[in-house]
Regions:
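Auxiliary, metal-adjacent structural segments of Zn-dependent hydrolase domains
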Residues: 26, 82-142
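Metalloprotease/metallohydrolase-associated module, dominated by Zn2+-dependent proteases
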Residues: 193-265, 269-304, 308, 317-331
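C-terminal motif of bacterial Sec signal peptides marking the signal peptidase cleavage site
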Residues: 16-20
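Acidic/polar, low-complexity intrinsically disordered N-terminal segments immediately downstream
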Residues: 22-106, 291-331
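Second-shell loop/turn segments in exported
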Residues: 70-78, 147-156, 160, 226-234
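Active-site recognition of the HExxH zinc-binding catalytic motif
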Residues: 155-184, 190, 241
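Surface-exposed patches in mature extracellular/periplasmic domains of secreted proteins
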Residues: 95-119, 176-185, 254-264, 307-315
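Bacterial N-terminal signal peptides that target proteins for export
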Residues: 1-9
């Protein structure tokens, strides 16, 4: 008798639940956001142009589980997703499908990126520093920020996109083909910081003064300390990936100028003690820069079996072709 009573009760509850659901307009009131026709078309484009050829899932819808808690990221505007991915393919992804460089099965797409995440805004940490990459993410994931401000006619935005992507792909390939971490770390271990706090003011000063491109790449603050970029100061892993990324977005002449300028001491304004200290710091910075440059070149050629300068020139050519196509004034 008790079993019959429980059965009847469950049947009644289920019937009421179904009746209630039948009255709801699920297509309009679902807790999940509806997929619009625009999104569906965009999904098809992403599948055809990115996922199939590169085996990487494109994720542009908001997922709070993949946003760093200390940042202020948000989802991109839909109309910006395709232009950014088109630029990414033209300036970065195509490089890794070029058979004259990557004929080995060890490279992309044999070891593809798993996912590409897109965010509308910057990836600012607690110090207000706009990071080009997600430090906590696995190397098989690519994070693209500042999607909403991207414009194919803005060379600085194109540069930032390429710098970010090349850093992350470089780190991915360095995971596949390990380098001598201890040897690289020995070239300048006392210069690294686990947070952006020591250099946050310097980094933001470039952005605030309208010199974003300089702040992201080669600048005196960085190379006078033996680095290719300010963000390279975050650690050896970030440093080598930054060196790779900067190399692929700067000319050989620009890197040589930075190397030479690193040897020039800061002005001591007549202070003899400061003059001696600055001279010693410049000597160390120059030596460190030279040693790091040689390390990266040797590692790429031996582990990847590709001359770094050939990759550099091809990367610059792809960037210039994209900028020329969109009639942008090249930086």
């Amino acid at each position: 008798m008790m079993k019959q009573y429980i059965y009847l009760t469950l049947t009644l509850v289920l019937g009421l639940t179904l009746a209630s659901c039948s009255k709801d307009q699920l297509c309009e009131r679902s807790v999940l956001p509806p997929v619009s026709e625009q999104q569906s078309e965009l999904d098809r484009w992403c599948q055809e142009h990115i996922t199939r050829p590169y085996q990487a899932e494109v994720i542009y819808r908001w997922d709070r589980n993949h946003a760093e808690r200390s940042t202020h990221t948000y989802p991109p505007r839909l109309e910006q997703v395709r232009p950014v991915l088109e630029a990414l393919e033209a300036t970065v992804l195509n490089l890794y499908r070029d058979k004259q460089f990557f004929i080995s099965s060890d490279f992309i797409p044999a070891h593809p990126l798993l996912r590409i995440y897109l965010y509308g805004g910057a990836n600012r940490d607690g110090q207000g520093v706009d990071l080009l990459f997600n430090r906590k993410a696995p190397s098989i994931e690519l994070y693209i920020y500042n999607v909403d401000t991207f414009s194919p006619t803005n060379p600085v935005e194109v540069y930032r996109l390429v710098r970010s992507a090349q850093h992350q792909i470089g780190r991915h390939l360095m995971t596949i083909h390990p380098y001598d971490h201890d040897r690289f770390l020995s070239l300048g271990p006392d210069r690294y910081s686990s947070t952006t706090e020591p250099f946050a003011d310097a980094y933001r000063s470039y952005e605030k003064s309208g010199r974003l491109r300089e702040g992201l790449g080669l600048n005196r603050y960085a190379y006078s300390r033996g680095f290719y970029s300010i963000l390279g100061m975050l650690g050896a892993r970030e440093d080598l990936a930054e060196m790779y990324s900067v190399t692929l977005t700067e000319t050989p002449a620009a890197i040589t100028r930075a190397e030479q300028d690193a040897a020039i001491p800061d002005d001591a304004d007549g202070d003899e003690e400061a003059k001696r200290r600055y001279a010693e710091e410049a000597k160390i910075a120059h030596e460190t820069f030279v040693q790091k440059r040689a390390f990266l070149s040797k590692y790429i050629e031996e582990a990847w079996r590709i001359p770094l300068q050939r990759l550099q020139l091809q990367s610059l050519q792809l960037m210039n072709q994209y900028l020329d196509k969109h009639h942008a004034t090249q930086p």
